């Protein structure tokens, strides 16, 4: 964004999220990660965040959100048709063989959907809501299971509908600290008899930051205040400040067996 010098942009941006995902990838010694981005208006922001976070991506793909196009694209990404043909070929080979345990092998093969692995350990999906569920469902259709590959998404704001989707679990995503969020919501509700939206949540800390800076600095050129590396601890979370950028230090969560768990 080309913002004036006296304007600050803050929030849970793509770079903040990828910094957290990068930490998770390192902790789990994940070697090959593919990145799936929908063909939407934030595509360029994602590309920039990948560069800024220096996260290692094996391959990047842009996909269409229209269901039939999406499924075909996921099939191509996962080499589904080749892996499906491998299974058909193996079934035919065993059927025509004289193996002693022929029936047992056939029984096992008929329970499978494909033969052959995919060339990645984890998938990052920069999507949300029903569109996200469609992508993961397409991965399941192509025999890529969250139980065998890490499925990582962007901040889902603790979407409770994901807890009910057993087939797409486990999944992982970065977000703000849930306890801090709940404390803020309760405080806000007591004061205003309503629950806050996410804009008010993020503004809560940012307004405090600007007030603090205004006490000791000239705000005619705000960008000068953010060139040195620094951190600001607010009520909601911690913000890292450096090179005129504000990044939110996030937690990482897992949804598995219909439960939410904080990983770090």
How should these model regions be labeled?
Residues 17-20, 66-78, 102-109:
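Structural motif
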Residues 26-30, 51, 55, 140-144, ...:
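Sec-exported extracytoplasmic/periplasmic mature domains
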Residues 4-7, 14, 55, 75-84, ...:
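Extracellular/periplasmic periplasmic-binding protein-like sensory domains
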